[in-house]
Amino acid sequence: METFSLLMGGSPSKMFHLKEFSEKLEDLGMECKVVLDVDYCDGFPSRKISKWVFKKNKLPNLISEYKPDLVLVDRQRHFGLEVTKTRIPLLVHLRGDFWKEIEMAKKTIYKSIPKKIVINEWEKIGEKCFQESTIILPICNYLSNVVKNRYQNKKIQTMYQGINPENWFETKGMKLKHPCVGIL
């Protein structure tokens, strides 16, 4: 049986979920590598102005060393944009309504000229990632419908974001004398 290798690039806040997902895929025989996307690829626009001047693109080295069959991104930024320049299939995991978020950002906190430039560039990068992706993986049916309305010919598959409660809560069994659903 052929083994596939998957490279996952994600944001710091999603590392936990990507690592957990990677462990499940490895249990199924897939080879996975999870990286912080900005460690390998960053530049204009970025919240850190220093990244505008000192661009980072270590992604070609990572790709040549790891040789992934697929790349999954959990946000639409430089990492995904650089993957679109390769022949490697790009899977985009969509966790929110990207277009509504951009629209609201433009109306609220990104009104100044420098911030307008940044948000417009983020929008262009996002659109390029979506357009060039092999498949878009929204986390719910609502988002799948949003994507279908924007990209009628794009492969879209809902990938539900399951949450394992054992990661946050200690679960101790309860000893019930008379278990019931409710009082009759």
Please identify what each model-predicted range represents:
Residues 162-178:
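Acidic anion/phosphate-binding donor-loop and adjacent secondary structure
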Residues 41-45, 92-124:
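Acceptor-binding helix/loop patch of EC 2.4 sugar-transfer enzymes
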